[in-house]
Amino acid sequence: MPSYLVETPQRCYSAIVERGIIGQTAQYLPPKTGKVFVVTTADVWKHAGAPLKAALAGIPFEILNLPGGEDQKRLAPVEALAEEMVQRGADRSSMVIAYGGGIVTDMGGFLAAIFMRGIPVLQIPTTLLAQVDAAIGGKTGVNLVSGKNLIGSFHQPLAVLTDPAILDSLPEREYRAGLWEIIKAGIIREVELFDYLSESRADVLARKPEAVDHIIAESVRMKAEVVSSDEREGDMRRILNFGHTFGHALEAETEYKRLLHGEAVAWGMRAAIYLGESTGYVSAEDSVDMLQMIEDYGPIPSLAGIRAENLLARLVHDKKTVQGKVHFVLPVRIGEVTVVSGIEEPLVFEAMRSALA
């Protein structure tokens, strides 16, 4: 049972990767817990709710359904659920279990962060992307029309319970979207993981348990280490944004309806690699290898009709923009990235145009 400690000033907790761990959920509820509220979506509960329902047998709990889709990741649904919690008798002894993909873990965590100034949350991610990224590290929030995750809070969970078995029924498109986040981990910090993804592509795409468990565990370990060293994105944690600055602009431009988050990140990594090469940070040889890896786990959906000019305008609204300067995470070599600001707009524009081609 791989278990990785996430150590932050707010809380120390475990991110556990184990098949069947959902069945042990009751062990992670604090003593004297009041009402338990499971934040999920109707679709997740219908297709993947059985393990958690069985695990909570004998424990009274309430289901709170969020609307599905990145375009619904807004403040209004969170407010509606908070009102519903009050009507159902929630108080400061209550807790939230966020059970779903990255949208649910973000919104469920945010609900827990702001309800009565903060109640506990247990994260149980049910998509690959949420398991290796979104559920770990305490980032919670919702989108604005202007950009992604512009309203949010850091709220560390009691634990993160990652059960690879829950992915057996995950749609192929969702699975591949999560794989791109794992590729990100390989590019920014984990050379051995990058090599494994290259050598074991067939096993990974076939979802062979040994391969899936390995890539999840390695990604969770990396994320736990980075968050433990830098909870609030002061320095080290910025490397996790590789592909996200460009990707968030693409998501906003498409009104959060056209792409899954992992697909936008895959395109964003392409743009960052092109920018890294044009600015001299990464060699052409490493650039080719990274781009090929992204392509091998593709395809990225068609981006026909997207204009680089519009994406450039979106970049200034990214939450990583400081004093008008956009910060880019660019590759140096496989396993290493750097944070750069002050890059001239024409270079950024050309990188995005190349990535759109």
UniProtKB/Swiss-Prot annotation:
Q: What is its EC number?
A: 4.2.3.4
Q: What molecular functions are annotated in GO for this chain? A: 3-dehydroquinate synthase activity; metal ion binding; nucleotide binding
Q: Does the keyword Cytoplasm apply?
A: yes
Name the positions where Zn(2+) binds: 181, 244, 261
**Annotated residues for binding of NAD(+):** 126-127, 139, 148
Location relative to the cell: Cytoplasm
Q: Which pathway or pathways does this protein act in?
A: Metabolic intermediate biosynthesis; chorismate biosynthesis; chorismate from D-erythrose 4-phosphate and phosphoenolpyruvate: step 2/7
Kindly list the cofactors needed: Co(2+); Zn(2+); NAD(+)
Q: How is the cofactor bound?
A: Binds 1 divalent metal cation per subunit. Can use either Co(2+) or Zn(2+).
Pfam families, sorted:
DHQ_synthase, DHQS_C
Q: Which domain of life is it from?
A: Bacteria
The reply on keyword Nucleotide-binding is yes
Keywords of the record, alphabetical order, are:
Amino-acid biosynthesis, Aromatic amino acid biosynthesis, Cobalt, Cytoplasm, Lyase, Metal-binding, NAD, Nucleotide-binding, Zinc
The record's Gene Ontology biological-process terms are: amino acid biosynthetic process; aromatic amino acid family biosynthetic process; chorismate biosynthetic process
Q: Which reaction does it catalyse?
A: 7-phospho-2-dehydro-3-deoxy-D-arabino-heptonate = 3-dehydroquinate + phosphate
Q: Gene Ontology terms, cellular component aspect?
A: cytoplasm
Job description of the protein = Catalyzes the conversion of 3-deoxy-D-arabino-heptulosonate 7-phosphate (DAHP) to dehydroquinate (DHQ).
Q: Which family does it belong to?
A: Belongs to the sugar phosphate cyclases superfamily. Dehydroquinate synthase family.
Under the heading PANTHER family, the entry gives:
3-DEHYDROQUINATE SYNTHASE
Q: What protein am I looking at?
A: 3-dehydroquinate synthase
> In which organism is this protein found?
Solibacter usitatus (strain Ellin6076)
